[in-house]
Amino acid sequence: MQLINNNLKILYSSLKKKKADYYFVSTSDEFLNEYVPDYNMRLKWLTNFSGSNGYALVSEKKNFFFTDGRYLQQANKELPKNFKIFDLNKENLIKFFAGLKNKSVLVDTKCFSKNLIIEISKSLQQSNSKLIHDRKNLIDCIWLERPIEQIKKFFILKKKECGEAFEEKL
């Protein structure tokens, strides 16, 4: 847990340099995958959460974590104690953002759906807050021992294994 607390401290310091109050990160990557490769497990690096569905909103003063009922027990076990954990079935994420008054939230918008970013941005505007697009993912910049991306050759499945030839799917 000491490593995770150190990762959080590094992020807090970077947030100050970016003049942002919060950083918003999820389990998904820039391809919006739910199950991401090790080198894109940004949420796990920051919070120690290893589930496939979660959002963290972190600042130097307050840390919030959102997940669904499948992962509540896991989140309580894996996250540092300074996180307040919410059940997404009971807490509306968009409304939560509306409660952030006069704040700025840094986010890599490539790692979220366009609709979610629009909804969060509207919600923040209602409370005189703003969303800041992180052009270069902040965690990628500070994650010094990030696993190497595995580049593998693609292969074509035989028709009997997938039902249709790949040419028919193009």
Predicted regions and their residues:
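N-terminal accessory/capping or targeting/presequence segment of soluble
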Residues: M1-G99, D108, F112, L116-L170
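Nucleotide donor/acceptor-binding cores
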Residues: N102-S104
